[in-house]
Amino acid sequence: MKFKKTIIDRARLGVAWRNFTASLRQDLANDFLRPMVPESWRNAVRKKSSPSPTRTSVRKEKPVVFVSYATDESLKGSHRYCGGEKLLNNLVLLLRRHGYEAFMVSLDGKHADWLAEHAPFLSIEEFKIRSARAGDVRFVSSWVKARPFLDECPRFYFWDQELSASSRSHFPDLAALMANHRIIRTAGVNRAVQAFHRCIFETEALAVRQLIDDVHWKPDPSRRIPNRVGYFDEGDHGAAYVRRIAELTKAAGLSLEFVQLSGVEREIITQMQQCGVFMALNIGKSHLWGEGGPMSPQEAMACGTVPVCYDINGPWELIQQDYNGVIARESTPEAMAEALISIYSVPGRLEEMSLRTLEIFTTSHSMEARWPEVSRFLDLPLK
């Protein structure tokens, strides 16, 4: 453990040193060298400099996009209930719906059959052949340890969805890739991840938030059971939290049914459509900054199910407090029960919040609403 920490600390020092020397050179140029250059010369240089091409310029052919997190035999590039895979899969689906050839890549070309709609998969060998034939390509990954894939990519786009990895065990690899200019552009899955990259690497990282496939995630009012509260198994704390929340809401005079959602994506969608409220029990991988999500509150919104969650990074970008959901004041069962009581104890409030959550999702958080972020990230035309 000490050895691993030493490697991470040395990588962080390396990044800090490179940023310091770059800043020193810039200060030297701005404060010492630039005043020595006559203004007339500087104006001449500005006039001769041609503007860089814009991202909306017309391309002769659409690029082919390859997306992967394939790492090794234990992480082949597809396994059940991997939220990161779902986001990458939905990225490929969005690209294909906009007319691009786009593929997921796993070691053997196979995928675990669990999503409502799987994007086409290629094996590493098929990917090598197709990428060699393609004229214009984009390589995308969310996992800097994906060596079988990234070793075949001269440069790639990095969509960081897991700060607990990027800031810790993956940091030396990430720092080396940044230093060697292997990463064309970085995007964070929320503002916290974006800010990390901007601060540490002084790069213009973008934000590409979760992609929820609203072709499949959509409301069905006929299935709604208003007093049903759904939740996922989020770890060892979950069962005790649910028991305590049930006790407190019952003591407040509410008769709520708490149902654990489980199964493959199509089954989860049906179960989510039945819930009046979804409570996200995820307390994050760090008590300070969480993990940047999770996706489930946004999936709930797509179904018109009111999300209630803890304050881990991400929900504040989805939820207007007490308008289309509630972010509990702290990560305790008491705070979650308090949020549920605030919704169910006021007649008509659940129905109002349900309409608002669906409206906000449709206008601001649908897959299509994310296209401007995605196209900017991958240097693609907006239209």
Report residues per predicted region.
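Conserved acidic donor-binding segment of nucleotide-sugar-dependent glycosyltransferases
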Residues: 232, 321-322, 326-333, 342-347
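Nucleotide-sugar-dependent
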Residues: 281-297, 312, 316-317
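Conserved catalytic-core segment of nucleotide-activated headgroup transferases in glycan assembly
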Residues: 80, 84-93, 195-268
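Short hydrophobic beta-strand element within catalytic cores of glycosyltransferases
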Residues: 301, 306-309
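Acidic donor-binding loop of glycosyltransferase active sites
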Residues: 273-288, 305
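Extended catalytic core of nucleotide-activated donor transferases of GT-like folds
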Residues: 47-53, 103-184
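A charged, aromatic-enriched C-terminal amphipathic alpha-helix characteristic of glycosyltransferases
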Residues: 348-381
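N-terminal pre-catalytic "stem/leader" segment of glycosyltransferase-like enzymes
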Residues: 9-134, 311-315, 327-329
